[in-house]
Amino acid sequence: ALESQLCFALYSTQLAMNKLYRGLLRELDLTYPQYLTMLVLWQRDRQTVSEIGEQLYLDSATLTPLLKRLEVAALITRQRSRQDERQVEIALTEKGRSLREQAKAIPHAAGCAAQCTPEEAAELRDALHGLRQRLDRQ
């Protein structure tokens, strides 16, 4: 039955999380993938497209249009690497850095909406990371 499938539980939960984040991110004018990209850059500014893609499990064909939209919004800059012309480096603008303050409340708001304690959220996150790592080894 559909309800007994792990893949469906993950899929339907992802849909619900995306809907939740869509509402939370509306005031920041970011999509969920754009928010994840900004999280990566807030953690460490100035990264190549391939470094960002590695962390988000996205290929450059998917990431490039997303980065172009962030550039149009003046949140990032895209520039060819001086060391390697094949690489494009992504850096936050001042506007992109300042958006971090507004975004700080989002994880807490998502946790409240999911009605998870911080411990439950951490346990679930760790279990999902473990599952993904095992699947990546296949």
Regions found by a protein language model. Name each.
Residues 18, 46, 68-126:
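Charged, amphipathic alpha-helical coiled-coil/dimerization segments
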Residues 37-38:
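Short alpha-helical "packing" element that flanks the helix-turn-helix/winged-helix DNA-binding module
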Residues 1-28, 122, 126, 130-133:
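N-terminal leader segment of winged-helix/HTH proteins
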Residues 31-33, 48, 93:
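Residues that mark the N-terminal boundary/hinge immediately upstream of a DNA-recognition element
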Residues 53:
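The alpha-helix within a helix-turn-helix
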